[in-house]
Amino acid sequence: MKRVILFLLTNFAVMLVLSVTARILGVDRFLTSNGLNMGMLLVFAALIGFGGSFISLLMSKTMAKWSTGAQVIKQPSSQEEVWLVETVRRLSTKAGFAMPEVAIYDGAPNAFATGPSKSRSLVAVSTGLLHSMDRKQVEAVLAHEVSHINNGDMVTLTLIQGVLNTFVIFLSRIIAYAVDSFLRRDEDESGSPGIGYWISSIACEILFGILASIVVMFFSRKREYRADAGAAALMGDRRPMIDALRALGNLDAGQLPKEMAASGIAGGGMMALFSSHPPLESRIAALESAR
């Protein structure tokens, strides 16, 4: 879940910078100089949309380390770190890709995998998770994160976000142009966008961006089921993953990081639309019914 939230926040920041830069450089004035050029607008939206998502992907590992204070284990200094590194090595080898970086950080029970590719990935585990589960359960969580990497979930998320970014920019500019044209009623023939265009485009980008995040979270929840199934396959047994999920469910909400509580682990209702993970009971049921 931390992986998805960090990606979305980074994507928002990058898109904001690119959008403001485009406005300063006069791209919007060019697009509306002789009426709205739909073809050029679509190209512009795709360049900014996919550019923003791929920049976010490239920054994902660095941002994850910075935001959590995760320390990569280069030389294990304890038996716990030796076990952690060797477990990730064994699981990644079984999955068929080079061992990712392994990091540990102080915090509530959590773990995540991130990185732009299998060969440049990171698996990070919190001390809270290591101390609240037995080793078999921790191994199942690690297998889950390794499965995320093996399934290419970060790249999939990037492509989905790129498409959504494109539509957010494209539709917001069209609506902004229509609003601006209505407000000005041809009183300004210069073709330069007015204040109505800027306000409307920013408002629409925020609104459509929120709606787009719901779509991203929907796909994220689907990928979680695949990662659970992948963990069961890597472990050769679905029981450890089920036990790990139940262990998470037995923790008090106050022991969980905020993003876990917002992911359906300790909440529901409308917020479920913005959850990166399905409810624990649904994940457990899916594992128990798998053949």
Swiss-Prot record:
A single GO BP term for this record reads: proteolysis
Q: Name one GO cellular component term.
A: plasma membrane
Q: Which UniProt keywords apply?
A: Cell inner membrane, Cell membrane, Hydrolase, Membrane, Metal-binding, Metalloprotease, Protease, Transmembrane, Transmembrane helix, Zinc
| Keyword Zinc among UniProt keywords | yes
Keyword Protease present in the record's keywords: the answer is: yes
Q: Residues in the active site?
A: 145
* Sequence intervals crossing the membrane: 4-24, 38-58, 159-179, 199-219
Q: What is stated as this protein's family in its record?
A: Belongs to the peptidase M48B family.
Q: Kindly give the PANTHER family that the UniProt entry links to this protein.
A: PROTEASE HTPX (PTHR43221:SF1)
Q: For this UniProt entry, what is the primary localization, expressed as one broad class?
A: membrane
The species is Pelodictyon phaeoclathratiforme (strain DSM 5477 / BU-1)
**What's the name of its gene?**
htpX
- Where along this sequence does the record place binding of Zn(2+)? 144, 148, 224
**What does the record's cofactor remark say about binding?**
Binds 1 zinc ion per subunit.
- GO terms for molecular function, please? metalloendopeptidase activity; zinc ion binding
UniProt-recorded name of the protein: Protease HtpX homolog
